[in-house]
Amino acid sequence: MKATQFNFHSPVLVLETFRKFGTRFAQLRIAFLLLGIVAILSCSVFADQRQTEITGPDRKDAIHVSEKIPAYQSRFGRTRPVVAVVGDNYMTELTDYVIPYSVLTRSQSADVFAIGTDSGIMNLYPALKIRPQESIASFDSRFPEGADYVVVPAVHHSDSPVLLHWLNRQASKGATVIGVCDGVWVVANAGLLKGKKATGFWYSLNDLEKKFKDTKWVRNRRYIADGNVITTTAVTASIPVSLALVEAIAGKDRASKVARELGVSDWNPAHDSNRFRLTIGSVYTILSNTVSFWSHEEIGIGVAPGVDEIKLALVADAYSRTYRSQAVSFAASQDTIRTANGLNLIPDRVFGKDDVADRMLVEFDSAPAVTALDQTLSQIAEIYGRSTAAFVALILEYPQY
């Protein structure tokens, strides 16, 4: 299954459908249609998961995979590596994109660039939008030798010819390619996982196994390094893999410093994949939240220059996956906002000018970024119920909840 097909991790087609059908009558018709879709989908998923329990690689099998990302080796006389975090302007997963960029930038161990397939606005899923620092064309002009590391987040068009061609050229120049979450689809479609060990988002693994049979798909690891290719599980695995990259580039002490700032105790790849699976309860939560369109609401997040984009990404991502709420950024003006680590954020709305949100979150405090995610999940549980918070943690593949 390609990332462009309907699944719970692709752009929120369900919520977008409701926005496009204005009348209650039309919305009710869509709701009943969704009931059938979810019922069919749940049967398919449960069947796939039963197969996984029988045929999926176990912990013992995963032990033979490299535990550490190979240490950085300088090329082209560079004093530190060039890292390209590349997304598709049409739609790219928010946290997959922002966290690797921000963690590596914060570490001051690499020259990191947020780039897009072109120079226009990049829509981030499930919320927010930015203007990339470079397009792939301008990046190539600036660094004709290529990047040392290329981070590939989940994108809506995982078979984009432009993205696949560019990724292959970077790999041919010696770049290490990191597929984060469903960014693994892009890496696999580029042919870079042939004969490799890899992992991926729990919901996608069965489909990845079926389509890419020449790849050894491994469970129970949040990230896997095999030669010059690294792959991860779902969204929140962007945190440990980014810290592992910092360690590979600048050493464990530097990685530990950044980890403490984020509120992370370690970045070990060990993982219990069996915890993450779609259940009847999960399907019921999705369905009941989706059809309760009268209680859908917007969550306003105030942003200003210097905003912590890691906290912003984690909070906006979580609130926009409840199937009850959508995060929207508010600023004092429509001007582009430069975040703490240099991303160019484009506000969704302007205070006092545009429609207000149903709820406005308080400003971020000084708590570490991962603490902000924990607090957000607790808030989601209070507002929408614990089952909704558990579903959000499931989709984020967040083991700490």
How does the language model describe each region?
Residues M1-A26:
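N-terminal secretory signal peptides that target proteins for export/translocation
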Residues A31-L41:
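Bacterial N-terminal signal peptides
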Residues S44-V177, W185-N189, R219, P240-Y401:
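Extended, subdomain-level signal for the structured scaffold at the beginning of enzyme domains
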Residues N89, K197, G227, T231-A234, ...:
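Glycine- and other small-residue-rich loops at beta-strand/loop junctions that grip anionic moieties
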Residues C181:
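Aromatic-residue-lined binding/catalytic grooves and analogous aromatic/hydrophobic interfacial grooves
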Residues K194-N220:
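A conserved active-site-flanking secondary-structure segment within enzyme catalytic domains
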Residues W217-I230, G263-V264:
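Conserved Rossmann-fold dehydrogenase catalytic segment
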Residues D226-V229, A234-V246:
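Loop-centered beta-sheet repeat module
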